[in-house]
Amino acid sequence: MSKKPVAQRKQLTLSSFIGLDGNSQSQPKSRAASVRSKPPAVYNPIFLDASSSDDETTEISSQSNNGTIATKKSSRDPRTAKLKKHTYLDLSVSPLAKLSAKKYARDSPKKPTSLDLSVSPLAELLAKKSDRDSPKKPVQNENSYTYRGLSESPVENKSIGDTLRKPPQKERKTSIVWLSDSPEKKVTQNERKILDSPLQRFSFEDFPNKENGNRHHLLTLPDSPPPPQPVKKPEKTMWQNETKTIQDKDSPANPLVSNNLASISTLLDSSRAPNTYKGSSRNLFEDSPEKSGSGEQGYKLGSAKENEIPTKPATASLERNSVTSSPSPAAPLKPRYSVAFDNSLADYLKDLAQNDNFSIDPNKQNTETLKSTLGFFRNTYVELMEKYCSLIDQIPAMHFNEIAGFQPNTFLKLKVMRQKFKARTQLVQNSLDKKESQLKAEQEALEKEEIEMQAEQAQQTVLSSSSPEKSRPIMPLPKVQEIKDEKIPNRNQLIHDLCGEPDNFSPPSSPRDTQLIPKRQQLINDLCGEPDDFSPPSKQNDPHLLRKCEELVHDLCEEPDDYLAQSMMLDGDLEEEQLNGPTQGTTTSGMDDDEDDLEGLLAEIEDEHQKMQGRRSEFNGYSYKELEAVKVKEKHKETPINISLDDDGFPEYDEAMFEQMHSQAAANKSRVSSAGPSTSKSVVPTKQTSALHSQKLSGNFHANVHNDGITGEFDGQKFEHSTRLMHGLSYSFGLKSFRPNQLQVINATLLGNDCFVLMPTGGGKSLCYQLPAILTEGVTIVISPLKSLIFDQINKLASLDICAKSLSGEQKMADVMAIYRDLESQPPMVKLLYVTPEKISSSARFQDTLDTLNSNNYISRFVIDEAHCVSQWGHDFRPDYKKLGVLKKRFPNVPTIALTATATPRVRLDILAQLNLKNCKWFLSSFNRSNLRYRVLPKKGVSTLDDISRYIRSKPQHFSGIIYCLSRKECDETSKKMCKDGVRAVSYHAGLTDTDRESRQKDWLTGKMRVICATVAFGMGIDKPDVRFVLHYSLPKSIEGYYQEAGRAGRDGDVADCILYYNYSDMLRIKKMLDSDKALQYNVKKIHVDNLYRIVGYCENLTDCRRAQQLDYFGEHFTSEQCLENRETACDNCINKRAYKAVDALEHARKAARAVKDLCSGRSRFTLLHIADVLKGSKIKKIIDFNHHKTPHHGVLKDWDKNDVHRLLRKMVIDGFLREDLIFTNDFPQAYLYLGNNISKLMEGTPNFEFAVTKNAKEAKAAVGSVSDGATSSTADGQSGMREIHERCYTDLLDLCRTIASQRNVTMASIMNIQALKSMAETLPITEKDMCSIPHVTKANFDKYGAKLLEITSNYASEKLLMQAVLDEEEEQAAAKQRPSTSGWNNESVDWDMAVASQGNANTSGASGFNSFRAGKRKKIYKSGASKRYKTSTTSPAARKTTSARGRGGRAGAKRAESSASSASGWKSKKTGNSFGFDLMPLPGSK
């Protein structure tokens, strides 16, 4: 990944580095760049003496000789400058240390460009004093020197990063005086007097003046109190005021200082040269000029203190000095800036104000008018902004410094960026114009050449086919220049005018193609039946023209290859088509090819058109270019035509030729370009298939659902970051391609857009922000709800060598402080920082860190994982998530990504509203988890646990899963039951301590525990991809909750089971929990009850597809036919749909409602079960006691199944026709049935009330049996030994990863992706290159764990090769044994009677022998592989089972061996009992 070019840092003044910049709150950490391309923080190259105090400074400053040279302060007002003392241990580290010469581009070639202090008079004087005083004076009294900036400092070339940044000392006041002198002038006697005087605490700074070549000298004086704000008087300059202030203060106490100041003032007046200001080319800071990126002097982008608002410009005093060269009091100040206005601008604005578009009422106009008006306003706005910016560009940025809140650096960056875009736009436009001109020139050349060729061919054709007696006059051909001027007609338009518009016709791409010359237009009108004023050159029945048409048809059909190239290809692939650029419409080859001369064929086309009497030709769908591209054979002599034609003059159908052309078309299909639409029908299925495939990936959402993932805006690799993106994907993550919508999301967020990403579990949401994080400078803040998820993600990224950290309360203080220090560095090393929402809402320290990062532009983006927790309409609302909306308000320019796997349309909108995401891009993927098999089974008390235990024990030992329970008590009871039945299980719920929960979760993740019995809170973000089953022992609380919980199975893409055990009483238990929660508001409680009714309806529905019900809840269309495409994963309703039939149950529901009305009126209360018994006609004691058996409602549904009656009443409750009121009796809820609020709709209206009832027993049994047989049928695998090798290899790889994960105290997924392990077991790599070519395997994780994994795969690869060799050898032997038996068919001496008599015994023994051989062969294969791996050889079945159990997965191997033996014996008995004829091989799939 290429590094960004590092912009050159601005050289700051020494005073700005040490804090003497007029800002009392200046801290070292505030000197940060505001652009991301800024290099790491630099420090002051001068070591400061932090031990010196203010008293020592004052003391030493009062001493003689060795004073300190004051540092120049880069404040806005020089009169408030302060003095700072700096001492050095040695002169070699002081700023006056001799360094190599440094040249400046602004220096003239005539004057010296180096700053060599060793030969200057000032350096000699200072060196003498240093030599004389250094052995006597302490270190604090060493002279120190200041320079106007690091660019002038002798230590500027030293490594800045090696120095230390010292905190600023207490500031002292100084006054700044500028001195000027010519470059040739030496130090005068007055100056030497000044140097030799007691006032030695000043410094001369030499730097060239760009205007007049003079050198300015800076004199800094100490111990001056801050002068009062002087009254602005034009007659006095700033320098005079300052000098007067110093004299007033120092003259009573120190006359020598006054004299020296007077001499300095005289020297200033005599030697100061005028210094004119040159507009915007001057820098904002005179002491640090530097070229910006745009070529203008200004703020260096990314410089320290860039956006601080000064009270006065830093160069205010310098500007006054440069403007006033003499102290003349009455000299007026000339304006420093000039702005040039366009004289026509006023008229332009007046015209715009009077434009008619301002009077348009948007509410009364149609769509086309509004689009036109919108285009006008957009274009005019761009034009206005260009004129506005041209004026603003003429005003220097320093002019706005006095405006409160103005950020000069941001202003200059905006200006530079606008200029870059403007220049880039102009560059692209110039390139486009150049290419268009070249293309136009090429087209004109081709037009000229092709017209000449057409003219020559037409003349030759007419001459060769004409006779002296009957010669038709040749129509004059227009000249090339004349044709260009007349604009040759478009051929497609001509075909349209001649024969009508074809079905697949597309309009011309340019107006130029629609223009026809008058002569040709008139001719076409005549041909198509309009008023005729044109006389054709020949008669209608001219035999010569008929012969010409027949010749043309013959030539077209005589060349099948050329005809095929035009009529059966998807799109034209001729080279001349590609030269004409991209085309549109179906006739791609003829859209732009409007330059040929058609006049030579118009008469023939007219005759043919009249002969056909309006009947359309099969060639009308093609362009003229396609017809003329066929070679026309030149015939010097007339030859007879040997092709039989039909009535229309076309060749009769020849089946042989058609098959030949069809085969050639298939061979040429790979060369066809797919750049444009095709006229061939063969492309339609291809495009429809791709569209369906894309639709399947993106999901078929409802019409009103917005999805930016399918618009194409963010598709492809056409962006500047695309190259780095693909490199990072391959290098850092070991992937070669993206999953659906991943590329679009990454492109959108790298372009700075806010994104809402909805992907199913296992869809790759993490990559959508992890890959952009490593491509962007700065920190990506990831907000995740669970610490366990954060822990897993950090370990996984650490294995990929990606720097990811987290902040939580459980970390050590040293680790936390190290992370905070890194976040304050520039730039931070951390790429992803994981935090919980509580950390953001409650930690003031972290909030301050975010502010610091944002001020330095080092926050790449915010990522909000599990964003459905934001919405109170969701199933897992968390209050701290709702507070995350402040992030967008506080950091509006930072992109945000919200990710979730479950969100209904209502929840999606609420998420965006809560997070304050306004212009957000939506990326929705299909909710369908095609590898999950959904089933709903009845829950029958305690026996259900036996069914669960039996189901788990029927699965392989390495299959793991989750059992969801409603309460803690259920979790404990279920886990105990599983352990009792031999299933390794553990419970997980909120009643355990954090240590216990973490330990149990780790045991389940690493495979020590096979099943975890947990409440619904478990599993969010759990990164365990090989979960093979998720069982719900109790009812979920909502459909979206069930979708997310069940979605934790099968994240590796393999088939997994999702089984829900349903009992209506679970719904009553959940309602009881909701009623007992007094903190719930009414509207929130109603939401939960509605969600509960939906999941009950999902379970009660026995006919509709389970997937369709789930996806419809999320706003996506799905059908039962799509579910049945893969019967292995089809839901139970789709498989068992034949066991039920849909009936119109409206009258039955009304009967049930009348029963409830009569039986439950007054104070009578009865449950749903009691009403069902009455409707069914039961005569239990309670019904007889209440005399309900005598009511007319008794037995009205006696023909129905009892379960169907229960389901009917439950459906009426869910639909609101009935209601259940919970009444608690001794803490046991009883649900009594009453009429619901919607009962009037049922009784008075005609609602659609379809209901599925069970068919009779025989029909149901036949239907279920037929489906079951089709679902359970499987084909025997002849390569069972090979499959066993791959399975054992996969088991060993899993065990190794679990062991490593357990040692490192991380999850197995953090070691290696589960898909990578499966690929390893399938491909069995033997080299590092082969291993690294597997997806998800990178150089980083291979260096850590690849060697051990490669050792396992290499061993199994050797075993596979040996087994393959044994298989090949035994197959050859079996084939050799079977060859002699084939000769018996021709033996006429066979005694067939004896054969029939002995058929039974002979056949039995033969079959037994054959089966024994086949079984022995397979056992021998397995034995060979085992003996190779385990260095042993066994012959007995018992010994072979023991050998299989020695390695890893031995228990599974023993079971496989046992099942193999049983299948072999079954095969043997089946053949023995059914073979009464020849000894034949069994059919594939039989046993």
Curated annotation (Swiss-Prot):
The keyword Hydrolase applies. Gene3D superfamilies: HRDC domain, P-loop containing nucleotide triphosphate hydrolases, Winged helix-like DNA-binding domain superfamily/Winged helix DNA-binding domain. It is found in: Nucleus. ATP binds at F738, R739, P740, N741, Q742, G762, G763, G764, K765, S766, R1051, N1313. Residues 944-1093 form the Helicase C-terminal domain. One of its GO terms (biological process) is DNA synthesis involved in DNA repair. A motif (Nuclear localization signal) lies at residues 1416-1432. It catalyses: Couples ATP hydrolysis with the unwinding of duplex DNA by translocating in the 3'-5' direction; ATP + H2O = ADP + phosphate + H(+). Binds 1 zinc ion per subunit. The modification Phosphoserine is found at residues 52-53, 92, 94, 108, 118, 120, 130, 151, 153, 180, 182, 197, 203, 328, 506, 509-510, 535. Residues 967-969, 1069-1072, 1167-1169, 1178-1182 are annotated as: 3' overhang DNA-binding. Sequence repeats lie at residues 89-112, 115-138. A motif (DEAH box) lies at residues 865-868. Disulfide bonds: none annotated. Zn(2+) binds at C1105, C1123, C1131, C1134. Residues 126-136, 163-174, 182-195, 203-214 have a biased composition (Basic and acidic residues). Belongs to the helicase family. RecQ subfamily. The N-terminal region mediates dimerization and homooligomerization. Both the helicase ATP-binding domain and the helicase C-terminal domain form intramolecular interactions with the HRDC domain in a ATP-dependent manner. The HRDC domain is required for single-stranded DNA (ssDNA) and DNA Holliday junction binding. Participates in DNA replication and repair. Exhibits a magnesium-dependent ATP-dependent DNA-helicase activity that unwinds single- and double-stranded DNA in a 3'-5' direction. Involved in DNA double strand break repair, including the synthesis-dependent strand annealing (SDSA) pathway. Involved in DNA interstrand cross-link repair. Monomer. Homodimer (via N-terminus). Homotetramer (via N-terminus); dimer of dimers. Homohexamer (via N-terminus). Self-association negatively regulates DNA unwinding amplitude and rate. Oligomer forms dissociate into monomer in presence of ATP. This is RecQ-like DNA helicase Blm. The lineage of its organism: Eukaryota, Metazoa, Ecdysozoa, Arthropoda, Hexapoda.
